[in-house]
């Protein structure tokens, strides 16, 4: 899909579908802005008959108004003094999603004089494209409806030199993350994930290293391998590196949980545990690889960025880890496994240790780690923890810019008491209360304390069961935009 603009005389414009935004003010004068496709007086009569006043979120749709236009959708933006860019993005996104099956090209005309910057225009374009996303890979009969190939913005006079190249690159990263999360577990195996990572490296000039089980044994990754050995599929430890040309001012590691399927192990997921949805337990790794794809195209300057994923399945066989086993992570700490369904933190323990040994300035990990964070924050907001105020504030800023909502949670040190073990250095789970916090405290044990670190729990935000905002039902690709924005802000 591409973005385009039409800046010349609108009388020469040709198109089939137009989305036109109006304010909750003098409608008649605003309708003059589309006289190039329809008689504004005739349209005003129809709008008046429908008692449409431009209220926020209200829409009117007209078919075949003129030979020059097949569909006109008028969307209310509310009062100019209350204009909110997020509301505009969601409104346009919803409309694009509703018309995506009907048109190869959708054109958009808004009161651009109320848009403050090129950034707001590109964010609108991003929302429109991500709202139009469809995944038909696994349908026997492919969707025969029209495929949206172009989103066009009309009359962007004050932004005539605008570029959507970076916007498209970010969208491609989000779309990759969505595809990875949505893929069934018999399709997206650890092997396939490593192939996807290798393709990113080849396409964008990143270094790639795939560690096999023997390599991980040599590095004494006992926690990661304890999870992986219950599956007949070999684990793949993925490490991509993006190095800017010229002097490196900062080194960063992005770590993603990569459970391509989680049965729960011997603490088997039963009842309402949604075992059938555990293909999305690699949502953190999808965000990291999506960010790698986007950043590989954007090529930020002065940075060395490491993308790390410990990919495997959590399954049951004769070799699977038992509840009560004690394993040793690659930093030498021993862990009593009191719950095999708290496996993500075990894989992350060795992934974080590996990242720490690279001596980065910052580490950010993303994981669908706990149900507790969903209970705490629901499905619209991800929780995050950090050991550094500057990093936390930078993430909050990136979150606000990207539109992906984060909420900082406490690293309550007294809760570490719940992780104490009588036979090992620690247990892998604490009591039910404060479960997302004790999970973060567990992870904090596996990297150098001098490194700035943040952990983002995306268990509630990586999937939506229904269309919501810019996200069609299914995988959201949550985390890609925030990671990319955080990097861009440096």
Curated annotation (Swiss-Prot):
It catalyses: Release of an N-terminal amino acid, Xaa-|-Yaa-, in which Xaa is preferably Leu, but may be other amino acids including Pro although not Arg or Lys, and Yaa may be Pro. Amino acid amides and methyl esters are also readily hydrolyzed, but rates on arylamides are exceedingly low; Release of an N-terminal amino acid, preferentially leucine, but not glutamic or aspartic acids. Pfam families: Peptidase_M17, Peptidase_M17_N. The keyword Protease applies. Its EC number is 3.4.11.1, 3.4.11.10. It is an enzyme of class 3 (hydrolase). GO terms for biological process: proteolysis. The keyword Protease applies. GO terms for cellular component: cytoplasm. NCBIfam families: PRK00913.1-4, PRK00913.2-3. GO terms for molecular function: manganese ion binding; metalloaminopeptidase activity. Keywords: Aminopeptidase, Cytoplasm, Hydrolase, Manganese, Metal-binding, Protease. It comes from Prochlorococcus marinus (strain AS9601). Its cofactor is Mn(2+). The active site is at 269, 345. Its main location: cytoplasm. Mn(2+) 2 binds at residues 257, 262, 281, 343. Belongs to the peptidase M17 family. This is Probable cytosol aminopeptidase. Binds 2 manganese ions per subunit. Mn(2+) 1 binds at residues 262, 341, 343. Presumably involved in the processing and regular turnover of intracellular proteins. Catalyzes the removal of unsubstituted N-terminal amino acids from various peptides. It is found in: Cytoplasm.
